[in-house]
Amino acid sequence: NEWKNDRWGILIGGRLDKHNMVDNVIFSPRANLRFNPTQNINLRLSYSSGFRAPQAFDEDMHIENVGGTVAMIERAKDLKEEKSQSFSVSADMYHRFGAFQTNLLIEGFYTRLTDVFVLGKPYDRGDGILVKTRSNGPGAKVMGLTLEGKVAYLSILQIQAGLTLQRSRYDEPHKWHDDAPAEKKIFRTPDTYGYFTATCTPIKPLSIALSGTYTGRMLVQRMDITAENAELGKMPERKAEAIRTPRFFDLGVKLAYDFKLYKTVDLQLNGGVQNIFESYQKDFDRGANRDSGYIYGPSLPRSFFAGVKISY
């Protein structure tokens, strides 16, 4: 249900879900309060809730190779749904400086997770296959601040950028392996990440697009390799540990030029480079006894591309 006028807006609602893996109907309420002190400033206060059902996920179907041994994921018999309660407050501001249009968004957020899905310590089920069990953890908190800005100059230049500062922690240290210390930080969640895009059209047929993503340091699990499995491939014996990854800045550029072939037919030639600075993982595991899940960072090394597009 929503009530609004020029300065105020109140939205209250909810959602009912019935999942075949959950016994009861789940009600997820939400609310939003908007206030506009001026025409160009939007202030918002929001609350929402949600859940993840204890179903099979894509990664559950993926069979990993860990130190020369097959590893699989199974669900605990008493696995319950993961629930979230989220709060956010934001200020969205617009202003025009002559031919320049600008927008700045500042948002703070806090999410409380209960019955968090966690993967337990791997064990051998007896047939040479390692099993990691997905169960419910005690809980977690995710909080942070997001800044986003946009600048546009006529139809010639558009720039957009965003930066998020985030803290994500379990309520209690999570023991993910016998050989490794427990960790409170949630794995694969960087404390800092951001992006930017810039598009320039100096002349009508030509467009230049520049884009980049920044990923801060994060913790990634690297599984152990036993002395027995070390003989199977290139990776030496090692203990399991949580690796703190380096920072990554993935920058790409694309140039495109349009040709008029006929009244309503255009031909575009384009080309560019992805990951210009070769910001890429340097310590992949290799060989038959590798940990195939030990992958992080940008998905592609430096790559060149070219294309042709016909539109009519």
Model-derived features: positions:
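Residue-level signature of outer-membrane beta-barrel architecture
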Residues: 1-3, 16, 35-36, 49, ...
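Membrane-embedded beta-barrel scaffold of Gram-negative outer-membrane proteins
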Residues: 36, 44, 78-135, 141, ...
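C-terminal beta-signal and adjacent terminal beta-strands/loops
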Residues: 114, 214-230, 257-312
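Transmembrane beta-barrel strands of outer-membrane/channel proteins
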Residues: 12-16, 31, 45-49, 58, ...
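Gram-negative outer-membrane beta-barrel transporters
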Residues: 4-7, 103-104, 109-112, 133-225, ...
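Signature of Gram-negative outer-membrane beta-barrel scaffolds
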Residues: 1-38, 42, 53, 64, ...
